[in-house]
Amino acid sequence: GWQNTDENSTHSIPPTTARFFRFYWTPEGSEPGSEDMDAAKWKPNLKIKELRLHREARLNQWEGKVGLVWRVAQATKEEEFGKQDCYSLSQVINLTKQYTGHSNGKTLTATLPKGKWKLLRMGHTATGHTNATAGGGKGLECDKFNPKTVRKQFDNWYAQAFVKTNPEIARRVLKYMHVDSWECGSQNWNKRFAIEFQKRRGYDLMPYLPLLAGIPMESVEQSEKILRDVRTTISELVVDVFYQVLADCAKEYDCQFSAECVHYQKVDLPMGEFWLNSPTHDKPNDMLDAISGAHIYGKNIIQAEGFTEVRGTWDEYPGMLKALLDRNYALGINRLFYHVYVHNPWLDRKPGMTLDGIGLFFQRDQTWWDKGAKAFSEYATRCQSLLQYGHPVTDIAVFTGEEVPRRSILPERLVPSLPGIFGAERVESERIRLANEGQPLRVRPVGVTHSANMADPEKWVNPLRGYAYDSFNKDAILRLAKAENGRITLPGGASYKVLVLPLSRPMNPEPVLSSEVQKKINELKEAGILVPSLPYTEE
């Protein structure tokens, strides 16, 4: 899902002069929720803590565009404000030296040109997020852009197992290091960010720093471009620093690196997650991220944290679990992690230790433990033993685009691009679902009310009617993809006959290709790769 709650939302509107303003809202037209539209999963209503009108222009949804929060939004429109509302570089004076150069470091003394000036003070601090499941080691999240702080977190955490015990025994026993789901918000700065930005993007970010407060500069188009570069730099640093340092640490201790989230280039064992009887919390995007990432980067073992549950009601049984597990095996995973098998030290307490109501209760005090748990586990083991020897056959590579952040593409988001493959019946049912007429609700599980028109994964089995697809990122297109015998081939062994460049969707509202990506796609087309015109309507 998306951690979309850390910041406010700013909506750009055309300049308007009035004494009184009235805003209307209606649930009509509200799209049903999905994993790329979390807030829409619930009953459509509007609760406002504060509505503030600005005297000056602000970039549309700038909080997400500057990387304060994971959020995707349309670019600010020229009609919302023009060039006259954007500050030029000549209107900005950097007073940092006058401030930091003062004897006490707290006083600003400067002589400014005549006129009215607005003073903007900018600094940086921790995000405020803590490592919530750390027990006695709880504290602020580390700086993900600094290799020293990442290494320090590792040394004071996982590496302590090799310090507090016999290191030789620890090396024989501890063979895996796992980083679980990303639940630490978003970081958009550190002491070296501007240096890394200039090295990676080729220009100095500091003159444009007011953009990080949503203040437009030069032009709307220029402002959006620079902030896209900011988000790209954030994304690269998370991979090149945080995940790379941890990957190096794992190798140092002879461990395989297992991880959830979307940085599978650096990990040995990608992992997704699927939920049991919990539509509002299910993670089809997580599953497709891990599966596509594993295929792209040649990782044969694809894991899943399975049977997480938002409110356990003690009605689960192996038959229910098997159907859900089979669907995810068919999707592409081949190693299951049970959520949850809690260590239970008591012999005289029933049901013993649980993880509150979160997750399947899978341990010895489950009522059907002696009746079906062993058979179910052995079934999963047999399936995985065969699946791990297999190799995926995938027909279509679907480009995820160049928006940041970006994730794998859910099948329902491909219907407008490939109506001929989905078929008329699916196109019509999707039209009705998205219309969401009357905004119907349902309750599942007990006590959880949400949109009845959500795109449930069980309704999207084999959605392309015999074809399979992987979501292709920019790295795969530019660095890995080659054309051989009419197919896109990757170093890890995957190959694809067709490359699809999807139409606009919520996660990529303006699918514009950069010159380098367009050049590579043209090369692939010239080498015989099929890139169909969209919408593709042939049956």
Identify the function of each model-found stretch:
Residues 21-23, 147-155, 396-398:
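Conserved long hydrophobic alpha-helices within structured protein cores
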Residues 1, 5-83, 181:
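Aromatic, loop-rich ligand-recognition surfaces of beta-strand-rich domains
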Residues 2-11, 74-163, 194-234, 314:
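Active-site-adjacent "subsite" loops/lids of carbohydrate-active enzymes
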Residues 38-41, 65-72, 136-139, 193-194, ...:
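Short intrinsically disordered coil segments
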Residues 18-22, 31-33, 45-64, 163-176, ...:
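Carbohydrate-binding surfaces of carbohydrate-active enzymes
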